[in-house]
C-alpha cells in the first residue's frame, strides 16, 4: 500500500496505481475493525460519487467492512452532501464516502468520519493509517442494507428555498 494516499483530510490517490479494489477492501477491513474497537460502533454509512472507478471501489470497501463484522447502510450514488444527509436520516453517525472530491477524474479515494458526522482530519487520519498498517483486523459477518437519501435531501433543500423566499 502506497503510504502517500493517507493525507491530511482523507485517503486519496491515482486509480488504479495508488488506489485500487485491493486497497478499498483493506480500508474496509480496517475501518470496520477500527470503529468496533476504538468507537464501539457496529454500523456505518457508505456512499460513492460518479467516477468510473467508484462502483468497484465501493463494492470492495463494503465487502471489507462487512467481513470485519460491521453492518453497512449503502447510500449508492450520491453527492457528498447527500451522503452526510443520508447518515443523518439513517441515524448513523459515521461512515465513508468513496470520492476524490475536486481532484482529477483519474483519482479516487475515501473521506471518512471516526467520531462524529464530518471528515476525519489530521491526527485522526494518521491514527487510522497506523491502525491499518498494523493489520490486526476483526472478522465477522455484517449485513448490508440500502437507503436512498436523494428524495429526502431534495425535499430538505426545497424547504430551505421556500423559507428563504418567505423572508
List the predicted regions and their residue ranges:
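Ferredoxin-reductase
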Residues: 39-116
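Gly/Ser/Thr-enriched, mixed-charge loops and adjacent short helices
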Residues: 108-167
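Glycine-rich loops and low-complexity Gly/Arg-rich segments
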Residues: 30-32, 69-72, 97-100, 120-124, ...
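Short C-terminal domain-edge/linker segments immediately following a structured domain
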Residues: 37-38, 75-78, 126-132
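An N-terminal, well-structured beta->alpha segment
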Residues: 1-63, 67-68, 143-167
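Residue-level signal for pocket-adjacent positions within structured domains
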Residues: 1-9, 105-107, 115, 139
Amino acid at each position: 500500500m502506497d503510504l502517500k494516499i493517507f493525507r491530511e483530510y482523507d485517503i486519496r490517490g491515482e486509480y488504479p496505481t495508488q488506489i485500487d479494489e485491493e486497497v478499498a477492501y483493506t480500508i474496509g477491513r480496517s475501518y470496520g475493525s477500527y470503529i468496533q474497537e476504538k468507537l464501539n460502533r457496529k454500523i456505518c454509512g457508505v456512499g460513492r460519487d460518479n467516477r468510473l472507478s467508484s462502483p468497484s471501489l465501493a463494492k470492495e470497501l463494503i465487502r471489507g467492512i462487512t467481513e470485519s463484522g460491521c453492518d453497512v447502510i449503502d447510500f449508492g450514488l450520491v453527492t457528498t452532501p447527500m451522503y452526510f444527509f443520508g447518515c443523518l436520516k439513517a441515524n448513523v453517525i459515521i461512515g465513508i464516502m468513496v470520492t476524490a472530491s475536486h481532484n482529477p477524474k483519474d483519482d479516487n479515494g475515501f473521506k471518512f468520519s471516526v467520531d462524529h458526522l464530518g471528515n476525519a482530519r489530521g491526527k485522526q487520519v494518521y491514527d487510522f493509517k497506523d491502525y491499518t498498517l498494523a493489520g490486526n483486523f476483526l472478522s465477522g459477518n455484517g449485513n448490508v442494507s440500502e437507503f436512498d437519501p436523494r428524495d429526502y435531501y431534495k425535499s430538505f433543500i426545497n424547504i430551505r428555498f421556500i423559507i428563504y423566499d418567505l423572508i
